Amino acid sequence: KIYNSAKMTLEEVLEVMFEAEEKGRTTVRLHTGDPSLYGAIREQMDVLEEKKIPFDYCPGVSSFCGAASALNLEYTLPDVSQSVIITRMAGRTPVPEKESIESFAAHRVVFLSTGMLEELSRRLIEGGYQADTPAAIVYKATWEDEKTFVCTVGTLAETARKNQITKTALMIIGDVVSHSHYNRSELYNPAFTTEFREATK
């Protein structure tokens, strides 16, 4: 039997699991993307652990990984970026002040903020980004109707409006989007010794 959890409360979801457990059935609680990111799974696991109902937690492919694939980019380019911040704008679920958009000035992936792009641009610029910083909007990453739009921090909202993107998208911010300048990784450099091979130059 298939249930659409989008129309269910946490209690209703858990009740389905409890009933299945009593009948010796297996329940698959399927999340989009990777459940560890904005998946609201901790509250489910806590109850299952309390009830001593065993479960397996299987990782998925997050849309930020799918978005990188869609844009043919690497988030961690030598001498460009070695860090990625996964964040979101505050909505009904607040964001801790120390994790606000303005407090981070790095390469980042922004979830759940497609309807607030003008504010996102403003706050990124207030936080130290230039308006011409490379950016991208990826709509429905890894889906059949996936769409990608390369723009800048200053044109995020305009790009979304022009292409009628209002939800189900994430934004990638930083020079990794343009991947126009970076140094080669030392990992595969013939002059670099690793645990598995000696340098040859």
Q: Which residues fall in each region the model found?
A:
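Class I S-adenosyl-L-methionine
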Residues: 1-58, 157, 169
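Short, well-ordered beta-strand core segments
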Residues: 1-2, 74, 108
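Short, ordered loop/turn segments at secondary-structure junctions
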Residues: 7, 32-35, 61-62, 91, ...
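A contiguous loop/helix-start segment that scaffolds small-molecule binding in enzyme catalytic cores
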Residues: 12, 22-27, 83, 92-201
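Class I SAM-dependent methyltransferase SAM-binding "motif I" and its flanking Rossmann-like core
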Residues: 34-105, 147-150
